[in-house]
Amino acid sequence: MDVSVIIVNYNTQGLTSDCIESIIAQTSAVEYEIILVDNASTDGSKEVFAQDKRIKYIYSDQNLGFGRANNLGIREAKGRYLFFLNSDTILLNNAVKLFFDFCEKNPDRKIGAVGAVLKDQNQKNIHSYGRFITPGAVSYTHLRAHETK
């Protein structure tokens, strides 16, 4: 197993269904599993996802919170790499394979974060992010501040 995709759901059955469908439709050329951890949803999620053979469904009878629910998913994961995905995410490209390829080409990197490009209904980008704080980012911000004076 190359990648375990871990999703936490709490009363977002419709969004989570769309997320899962996008993973399946957009992912190829990589071996992956989808692990869905349900944080005691009351919106019918259990009835929908417990029957879905394409996913590994884990139901918690209490809301564990996001972090503990992810840890529950990690315990069940078989993949060499873990891909944490929010339930309201739709993949538009072969992101799981791109993630896997990056991990394989960069074995010295042990942890990473990937930010999404948000798009509106017309596929225009929505600015939704900033820079990570790194020495380079601090220097860049400091230099830019002095240029504007």
PLM-predicted stretches and their roles:
Residues 2-4, 33:
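Cell-envelope/extracellular polymer assembly enzymes that use nucleotide-activated donors
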Residues 60-77:
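Glycine-rich, basic loop-to-helix element that forms the pyrophosphate-binding segment
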Residues 31-40, 58-60:
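Short beta-strand/loop segment that forms part of the nucleotide-sugar
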Residues 94-127:
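Conserved donor NDP-sugar-binding/catalytic core segment of glycosyltransferases
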